[in-house]
Amino acid sequence: MANTMLSLVPLHRNDLPVDTVDLARFLLGKYLVHDLPEGRVAGRIVETEAYPVGDSTNHAYPGRRACNGSMFLEHGHAYVRLTYGIYHVINVVSEPEGTGAAVLIRALEPVAGMEWMQARRPGTTPGDLTRGPGRLALALGVGPGFDGADLCTGRGLWLGAAGRARTPPPFAVTTRIGIARETHRLLRFYVPGSPFVSGPRKLLTGEAPRPG
């Protein structure tokens, strides 16, 4: 599970699809990395949700406000928001500057810095450290100070790939969770069989993957 020797290459902005649904698929199998003074924490992305333009559950749907301003940055920036008044969650801005859309990172497979993740989430089993958007942000040490961060710099908090691999793994698709509207839309993407996927465990075997 953890591989602190994994060699990662930063993703540049022109590597990222400029489309919310395409980006949600593309990010599967990529890595979210946080370089800390004490070392690196990182996880392989195994679950995402798309919140495209025109979706009423998209936080930018009502227009630009102080709380969602980073969603209108250029694609590849972070939108970090507070949810349920408790947890911060990490989104990747997914459309051209001024548009307002993002992809939520829902789950990671830990690959580096397990000891620091466990220090932030004491008493948590390894399988639950990063299984869910609030859990993974806490495990990686990502809070409101990262809202608006550029994830394409290869420094601080950034997106990476293993070597030059850019093609996502086979994925499955289902409906989003934790929302009250537009619940029928198939905008949640995940790596089938991964024990780190959040929500019901039936997703481990319950839905056939769609090719990437």
Swiss-Prot record:
Span-the-membrane segments of this chain are none
Stored Gene3D superfamilies:
Methylpurine-DNA glycosylase (MPG)
The record's listing under InterPro entries reads: Formyl_transferase-like_C_sf, MPG, MPG_sf
Instruction: Name the SUPFAM superfamilies on file.
Output: FMT C-terminal domain-like
Per the UniProt entry, the Enzyme Commission number(s) are 3.2.2.-
Q: Which GO terms describe its biological process?
A: base-excision repair
Keyword hit for Transmembrane helix? no
Cite the GO molecular-function annotations of the record.
alkylbase DNA N-glycosylase activity; DNA binding
The alphabetized UniProt keywords are: DNA damage, DNA repair, Hydrolase
Q: Which Pfam families match?
A: Pur_DNA_glyco
HAMAP family with a match to the protein in the record: 3MGH
- What family name appears in the similarity comment? Belongs to the DNA glycosylase MPG family.
This chain belongs to the protein called Putative 3-methyladenine DNA glycosylase
Question: Mind giving the lineage of the organism this protein is from?
Answer: Bacteria, Pseudomonadati, Pseudomonadota, Betaproteobacteria, Burkholderiales
